[in-house]
Structures are given as structure tokens and as C-alpha cells.
Amino acid sequence: MRPVTLNTIPHKSYTFKGGSTLIDGLYGDMNYRSGRWIGFYGTDMNVTLDLLEPKEVSSVFVNTMLNTGDAIFGATGLKVEVSEDGKNFRRVASENFPVVEKGTKMQSRKDSVSFDKVKARYIKIIAEVTPKLPAWHSMPGEKLFCLLTK
């Protein structure tokens, strides 16, 4: 399995197997406590994937859990940066996604971004989250969870 560095720390309730949760090939189901989701509370997910050798890459995706009743919202943006040395990164893609709307049913959503093919050893993936729950939520202004799986 390729090494994954968590540049932001997941919430203690949703750490499970750490960064390997994002690349172990096991997708999360609707039970977000199953150990197949990694969760961030009020902060963006920022991880670096080491491919061990330079490889061509042209897309990245993450699956996010949507469960507004439990204050679990998807990513609002996905940024991808690449590097040959793991220190100097350059952005190759950035995509925004809509904030989850009131009444959205519980589901898993695939957020992806495609870009011109690049060769890189390291890939930094940043999943941006809504900083606070929207006005329509029962806890407006509070922090929210963003749960991700591969």
C-alpha cells in the first residue's frame, strides 16, 4: 500500500486506520461508524499520497458522506497539487462543489476533478469543507463534519 501522510488531523472519533482508510480499496457504506470513513471536524482534509515513483496522473476523486441531520456535509472544493520531491508542490487542479442543500437525503457523493496528464511522485489532495453549518440547519453557525473515503 502506498504511504499517505495526513497533513490535517482527523477527528478522534473518525480516525480509524488513518490515511490508509483513503486508499485501502474498501469503500464506505451508509454506516459512517464502520471504520471505512475518515472524518474531519471544522477543517479541510489535506493529505499527501506518495506513489513511490513518478507516475502519470490525470484525475483524483474522493467519496464524501452526506447526512445533514448529523451535521455531515460533503466537500465544497477539491484541490490537487503535485510534486517530484514531496516539498515543492504546484497546483494542477481546483474544482468547487455546491454546499449541500436543505432536504438532501443521506448518501455517498463522488467528488472528482480531472486535469491534463502530469507525471509526479507525490499528490497532495485538499478537500475543502463548509466552515460552519448553514442558517437553515438546526445548529446554524456550528462546525460540521466532513467524512471521506476513497
Locations of regions flagged by a protein language model:
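Surface-exposed loop and turn segments in beta-propeller and other repeat-based domains
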Residues: F97-G103
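Predominantly extracellular/luminal regions of secreted and cell-surface proteins
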Residues: M1-G28
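Aromatic, loop-rich ligand-recognition surfaces of beta-strand-rich domains
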Residues: G28-A93, Q107-K150
